[in-house]
Amino acid sequence: MKPSVILYKTLPDDLLQRLEEHFSVTQVKNLRPETVSQHAEAFAQAEGLLGSSEKVDAALLEKMPKLRATSTVSVGYDNFDVEALNARRVLLMHTPTVLTETVADTVMALVLSTARRVVEVAERVKAGEWTKSIGPDWFGSDVHHKTLGIVGMGRIGMALAQRAHFGFGMPILYNARRQHPQAEERFNARYCDLDTLLQEADFVCLILPLSEETHHLFGQAQFAKMKSSAIFINAGRGPVVDEQALIAALQAGEIHAAGLDVFEHEPLAKDSPLLTLPNVVALPHIGSATHETRYNMAACAVDNLIDALNGNVEKNCVNPQVK
């Protein structure tokens, strides 16, 4: 008899077929309490869980006494109560490698679009404001050979450094938990403390996961240390930044602009001051959102769940110690 799993995300037909070859699959729209109640028996019998973006906490785990593994279609897992998973010896699988290059592309797009004011200027053209040769009020800033500061030199940070160093001749500063010899050798990157990075970088790119340690790592004090000409990019997790402090820094001219793919609360509220600022490029958390990469992430998540329920946790497992 096949193990039972709950699927709370739509999959391409071929991936759903692959999942069904290995498991008895119950598809649900979400993991809200009313949904769990409607499918109580399926949740009670499920040994696996696959999806993304929904909260998986102790209350849900109480309804799933047979759960052995959960697989998220994402690299981030801050929506999972890892402590509760560990207590129940439930494996947590994620997709850390397949989205690296695509997210780095998005970060570089934010660097370019903020510096060159691409979104703002394009909207002015659409509004009919281009009636003569443009003047300085349409100009942006150079990207090439400017100093890029990367906070978080993981896979995505490395991919960003590659683009910036080889493509744009940008000197690289970085701050991370530990020095990264490969980054220093390949990109001539310079390790420095956060204050030094903030003071020297023309672009500050934040690529950090959310944790107790990183929550509101960036606030008023950090923005005050940046150059007034500096551009801030966040493509990690929204709550790593005190959003009100960011808004205040932008409004006061303490920093020049911001490119944001993540926010403290998502979706971003329609009345957010960020949406009124012309020097802000706001994206709807599209870091990995290409057809190709989202397919590859889903395929990886399916394979991860198959591996986990077969006792294979050699890759992509957050908590292999609970096996």
Swiss-Prot record:
GO terms for molecular function: glyoxylate reductase (NADPH) activity; hydroxypyruvate reductase (NADH) activity; hydroxypyruvate reductase (NADPH) activity; NAD binding. SUPFAM superfamilies: Formate/glycerate dehydrogenase catalytic domain-like, NAD(P)-binding Rossmann-fold domains. It comes from the Bacteria. Keywords: Cytoplasm, NAD, NADP, Oxidoreductase. GO terms for cellular component: cytosol; plasma membrane. The keyword Hydrolase does not apply. Pfam families: 2-Hacid_dh, 2-Hacid_dh_C. Belongs to the D-isomer specific 2-hydroxyacid dehydrogenase family. GhrB subfamily. This is Glyoxylate/hydroxypyruvate reductase B. The gene is ghrB.
